[in-house]
UniProtKB/Swiss-Prot annotation:
Methyltransferase as UniProt keyword: no
GO biological process: one example: DNA-templated transcription
EC number: 2.7.7.6
Domain of life: Bacteria
GO cellular component, one term: DNA-directed RNA polymerase complex
Keyword Nucleotidyltransferase set for record: yes
Keyword annotations from UniProtKB, A to Z: DNA-directed RNA polymerase, Nucleotidyltransferase, Transcription, Transferase
Catalytic activity: RNA(n) + a ribonucleoside 5'-triphosphate = RNA(n+1) + diphosphate
UniProt-recorded name of the protein: DNA-directed RNA polymerase subunit beta
Gene of this entry: rpoB
Organism placement in taxonomy: Bacteria, Bacillati, Bacillota, Bacilli, Lactobacillales
Length: 1188
């Protein structure tokens, strides 16, 4: 027997064909959401408060300080928040201290700071009753970047940019004349020496001394206009920068100085963030820049005088490691003191080394480092600017390397916590201005923190973010896999990110650093391709927001692959060589072969085993969760694998789902972490279990109660239904499944079914990927799903009186009211179809001016129907089904309703949708198709043992698409069915063809895995043997019921009077200009005329035509289309004298709609009234006939 048994949870065993032993379990798959939010609660929120506070007033006599904060209990539980359309949020109370610096008085007070949405255990937020997800954003990391560009003459120039988290950009660039310029905040460029002089180094020799001799420096000094040799050059340089930043304003040295300080050196205005400081220090650090260079001077320990490294030595990694503590200490440190006019007058500490030029061995190049400022320094320092300039000048000398912006070492993730912190910071900054004004205006003695703090800007910023940000998305709840994928999504769009139109190919492309960090397969097709990605299965964020992936460490001394796990970011991985997970190992953990396949900086090649530093932990670390659920992924073309991964997320939860016979072993983990199942929080024993709740007694005697959700409407209108798995007496361990969620079976993801599939054509019905299906799948509800739709009706106060919900509806027969209760609300369990009343509601209507006689009659007989009109909630088109639930909210019951609403009724209707012709189906390999014919079971082809085939697919769909995985799945699935087992074939480590054939033979199938099929209609065998097997097929959310649409009479657009478009508006089909050309080409003038008039926007014409048809008279001639009148009016509005003349040059009157001259034209608001009148006349006729 090939393969080995593996248990997944307590309910499933699979035969796995994996060969590589897993050394690391998958992390919790939604930790990117939950961990980030927890960090925000623990430290992120505190940091934001500490960034903005303390706040002083303008005279610096009062100061508001932050003390601490506390979250109280949420107002609603999760379930209540869903029912009441409320947000699941907790009140936050912040303690402030107000210090009066003149009197020393301190007032401490706790201030309510609004309700803050709280993340659920599933990684989602409930906002206004709907479940939402904050998608993590992939952005360019703050830091310093260097680039090169080739001009039209083929000359290479260099550029550099310092990008902060917030603040002004600082750029450097060279031009064709070899002069270096700087730009501050995207303004006009100035020679870079001007900025150096502004920093307090005004002499030409001083500048050369710092950066060393180079053509770029000399040319720029020549170009620099500040020639007078004194410290006043600094003043002039400052003024020139001021003029660039604030053109037209009067410039003084002091204002120039304070402006530059504010732009770069003030931590409140300029913030690199922790990650920016880390990236700047890493890039400008002297150690990485000296690597593999030849040193041009002796390196001497200043304290002992000992020569550490002699001139001419190559600075290999081992040499640098040997003097590392000296490099981190005071080796070659120079302290420069700026002149008194400088922006920052503190001494500037730099590290300077001289190395041999890689281009010209006779020249010496100076490398200047920023001497590693502390991580706490979040603003730029003069040392950073000088070190950046040095790196930039070194690039022209062949030292250093330019950055690749698409490298994942330069792109980071902003997860929920950080996005929320940024939003909170915006709110606090708005509040700060407010507070400062109030502190200055009001009397200091009576001020309390409560009085000066207005929390509205903060709550508004948070609300706006959750409600309308591009990154706050309605959760994709088609099935558990789509929930999980949505929580792990990484978007490069959104505020501060890219836009679809500006993103080129490079940003969207797969990059070698995506390996193990971002899935190269799962991304949408269409305009967002490559901009929206998914985290790989083992991906994990470090404290700076860079994605790490785990590797097994290789002990270089012994050559052993250890089980020690090291997590590396993309730029750390660039320094090492990594072997693949399938490298063959001996028993003792050493490599079995001298040469192994590996990767180094994007090169995939063979390496000697002795140079390998790390080994992949698992073959599936490359791909995301949805992709890891595709068996035989390694045999599919990547374009089709992309479709397969995406379509699994569109699977509709079925009534009785089945886990796949051929899985990948990922199904259990995906279901477990998706948040859709009920998972045990602690060990214990089940003491009660039914469909709605499970009670578990812990070992310490306490009782846990788990509520099971039954048929709740999901975000996408499917039934969210959980099924209990445990029974009384079961022993449960922490992490076990208590109940399956939707699309799960026995604790495994189960998106579809395992039908018997044959690859064969049949009467041409599976042309172009169409799917032929057996009636068995319809009759036995194999592909039946339940869909829930929610309808609501509310009563409001109107000017003419309140609306009311009632059974007494004017002009409605008793038949229509049979399922309404005494209030006029539909009963639960009623079967309803289109047009049925769900909630009876009447609205008062304005009285027309009645004569005295009419008023008298009205008063005597009290004719109710005159005063109110019927505004009942009715079942819309396509909403037929069974009433599943009714919820009533009223003010009297203490429900919170919008202002002006007195009562709200919600009705939930369940539909059972069987599979039908026109529904879309798919396999897991991107093989999708539409059901074209449902054939009676007796007519389907059958196997020699009499089993009829369930589905027939077109074999032509395989070769050109190159997704051969489906054929392998087919054969292995048949073997699994015959053997009565389930199989796991993990991606890139699954069943080989030998395993496949061994299993096929074991199952007693023929050696070619094909079979003879018999025609169900004739009983004759087909000519050729056919591939028949079991393939996992899913029903997708694109159902024909949601798409089929037809219109007879419906609404019209107000301006053009043309029919609306789209199914939702009950619209018509657009007859566009190309269709008009087609009819013109045929010369079908009468057809064309009626399409452009009666059927479109000839208002009077269509009313006359309707009347003529209903009365059986000939249809009158059409009039002028309304859109022509609109065109004439638009031209007249431009002041053009536009008239319409007939063939005798007489002006044709274009009548306005409201000037009804002709009495025999019906002026009807809508055709409904005409219909009612017609129906009434017909009824009267039939009544008189009955009487006769």
């Amino acid at each position: 027997m090939a393969g080995h048994e593996v248990r997944y949870g307590k309910h499933r065993t699979r035969r796995s064909f994996s060969r590589i032993k897993e050394v690391l379990d998958l992390p919790n798959l939604i930790e990117i959401q939950t961990d980030s939010f927890q960090d925000f609660l623990d430290s992120g929120l505190k940091e934001v408060f500490e960034d903005v506070l303390p706040i002083s007033n303008f005279t610096d006599t009062m100061e508001l300080e932050f003390v601490g904060y506390e979250f109280k209990e949420p107002k609603y539980t999760l379930e209540e928040a869903r029912i009441h359309d409320a947000s699941y949020s907790a009140p936050i109370f912040v303690t402030f201290r107000l210090v009066n610096k003149e009197t020393g008085e301190i007032k401490t007070q706790e201030v309510f700071f609004g309700d803050f949405p709280i993340m659920t255990e599933m990684g989602t937020f409930i906002i206004n009753g709907g479940e939402r997800i904050i998608v993590s954003q992939l952005v360019r990391s703050p830091g310093v970047y260097f680039n090169d560009k080739v001009d039209k003459n083929g000359k290479v120039g260099y550029g550099s940019t310092v990008i902060p988290n917030r603040g002004a950009w600082l750029e450097l660039e060279t031009d064709s004349k070899d002069i270096a310029y700087t730009r501050i905040d995207r303004t006009r460029k100035i020679p870079f020496t001007t900025l150096v002089r502004a920093l307090g180094f005004s002499g030409d020799d001083e500048i050369v001394d710092i950066f060393g001799e180079s053509d770029l420096v000399r040319n720029t000094i020549e170009k620099d206009i500040h020639k007078n040799p004194s410290d006043s050059r600094t003043d002039e340089a400052l003024k020139e920068i001021y003029e660039r930043l604030r053109p037209g304003e009067p410039k003084t040295a002091d204002s120039s100085r304070s402006l530059l300080i504010a732009r770069f050196f003030d931590a409140r205005r300029y913030d690199l963030a922790a990650v920016g400081r880390y990236k700047v220090n890493k890039k400008l650090n002297i150690k990485t820049r000296l690597l593999n260079q030849i040193i041009a001077e002796n390196l001497v320990d200043a304290e002992t005088g000992e020569i550490l490294v002699e001139a001419g030595t190559e600075m290999t990694r081992s040499v640098i490691e040997s003097i590392e503590e000296h490099l981190d200490g005071d080796l070659n440190k120079f302290v420069y003191t700026p002149n008194d006019y400088a922006v920052v007058t503190e001494p500037v500490v730099l590290q300077k080394f001289k190395v041999v030029s890689p281009i010209d061995p006779d020249r010496v190049v100076t490398i200047v480092g920023n001497a590693n400022p502390d991580d706490k320094v979040r603003a730029l320092t003069p040392a950073d600017i000088l070190a950046e300039m040095s790196y930039f000048l070194n690039l022209a000398e062949g030292l250093g390397k330019v950055d690749d912006i698409d490298h994942l070492g330069n792109r980071r993730i902003r997860a929920v916590g950080e996005l929320l912190a940024n939003q909170f910071r915006i709110g606090l900054a708005r509040m700060e201005r407010n507070v400062r004004e109030r502190m200055s205006v009001q009397d200091n003695d009576v001020l309390t923190p409560q009085q000066i703090i207005n929390i509205r800007p903060v709550t508004a910023a948070v609300k706006e973010f959750f409600g309308s940000s591009q990154l706050s998305q309605f959760m994709d709840q088609h099935n558990p896999l789509s929930e999980l994928s949505h929580k792990r999504r990484l978007s490069a769009l959104g505020p501060g990110g890219l836009t679809r139109d500006r993103a080129g190919y490079e940003v969207r492309d797969v990059h070698y650093t995506h390996y193990g960090r971002m899935c190269p397969i799962e991304t949408p097709e269409g305009p967002n391709i490559g901009l929206i990605n998914n985290l790989s299965s083992f991906g994990h964020l470090n404290k700076y927001g860079f994605i790490q992936t785990p590797y097994r460490k290789v002990d270089r001394a012994t050559g052993t692959v250890t089980n020690e796990i090291v997590w590396l970011t993309a730029d750390e991985e660039d320094e090492y060589t990594v072997a693949q997970a399938n490298s063959k190992l001996n028993e003792d953990g050493t490599f079995a072969e001298e040469i192994v396949m590996g990767r180094h900086q994007g090169n995939n090649q063979e390496f000697s085993a002795s140079v390998v530093d790390f080994v992949d932990v698992s073959p599936k670390q490359v791909v995301a969760v949805a992709t890891a659920c595709i068996p035989f992924l390694e045999n599919d073309d990547s374009n089709r694998a992309l479709m397969g991964a995406n379509m699994q997320r569109q699977a509709v939860p079925l009534i009785d789902p089945k886990a796949p016979y051929v899985g990948t072993g990922m199904e259990y983990q995906a279901a477990h972490d998706s948040g859709a199942a009920v998972i045990a929080q602690q060990n214990g024993k089940v003491v009660f279990s039914d469909a709605e709740k499970v009670e578990i007694r812990r070992q310490d005697g306490s009782l846990d109660v788990y509520h099971i959700t039954k048929f709740r409407r999901s975000n996408s209108g499917t039934a969210y239904n959980q099924r209990t798995l445990v029974k009384v007496g079961d022993i449960v361990e922490k992490g076990d499944f208590i109940a399956d969620g939707p699309s799960m079976e026995n604790g495994e993801m189960a998106l579809g079914q395992n039908p018997v599939v044959a690859y064969m054509t049949w009467e041409g019905y599976n042309f172009e990927d169409a799917v032929i299906m057996s009636e068995r799948l319809v009759k036995e509800d194999v592909y039946t799903s339940v869909h829930l739709e929610e309808f609501e009706s509310e009563t409001r106060d109107t000017k003419l009186g309140p609306e009311e919900i009632t059974r007494e509806i004017p002009n409605v027969g008793e038949e229509a009211l049979k399922d309404l209760d005494e209030m006029g609300i539909i009963r639960i369990g009623a079967e309803v179809k289109e047009g049925d009343i769900l909630v009876g509601k009447v609205t008062p209507k304005g009285e027309k001016d009645l004569s005295a006689e009419e008023r008298l009659l009205h008063a005597i007989f009290g004719d109710k129907s005159r005063e109110v009109r019927d505004t009942s909630l009715r079942v819309p088109h396509g909403g037929d089904g069974i009433v599943r639930d009714v919820k009533i909210f009223t003010r009297a019951n203490g429900d919170e309703l919008q202002s002006g609403v007195n009562m709200l009724v919600r009705v939930y209707i369940a539909q059972k949708r069987k599979i039908k012709v026109g529904d879309k189906m798919a396999g897991r390999h991107g093989n999708k198709g539409v059901v074209s014919r449902i054939v009676p079971v007796e007519d389907m082809p059958y196997l020699p043992d009499g089993t009829p085939v369930d589905i027939m697919l077109n074999p032509l769909g395989v070769p050109s698409r190159m997704n051969i995985g489906q054929v392998m799945e087919l054969h292995l699935g048949m073997a699994a069915r015959n053997l009565g087992i389930h199989i796991a074939t993990p991606v890139f480590d699954g069943a080989s063809s030998e395993d496949l054939w061994d299993t096929v033979r074991e199952a007693g199938m023929d050696s070619d895995a094909k079979t003879v099929l018999y025609d169900g209609r004739t009983g004759e065998p087909f000519d050729n043997r056919v591939s028949v097997g079991v393939m996992y097929m899913i029903k997708l959310h694109h159902m024909v019921d949601d798409k089929l649409h037809a219109r007879s009479v419906g609404p019209y657009s107000l301006v053009t009077q043309q029919p609306l478009g789209g199914k939702a508006q009950f619209g018509g089909q657009r007859f566009g200009e190309m269709e008009v050309w087609a009819l013109e080409a045929y010369g079908a003038s009468n057809v064309l005329q009626e399409i452009l008039t009666y059927k479109s926007d000839d208002v009077t014409g269509r009313l006359k035509a309707y009347e003529a048809i209903t009365k059986g008279k000939p249809i009158p001639k059409p009039g002028v289309p309304e859109s022509f009148r609109v065109l004439v009016k638009e031209l007249q509005s431009l002041g053009l004298d536009m008239r319409v003349l007939d063939e005798d040059d007489n002006e044709v009157e274009l009548r306005d709609l409201d000037e009804g001259e002709d009495d025999d034209i019906m002026h009807v608001d809508d055709l409904e009234k005409a219909r009612e009148k017609q129906a009434q006349e017909t009824q009267e006729v039939s009544e008189t006939t009955d009487e006769k």
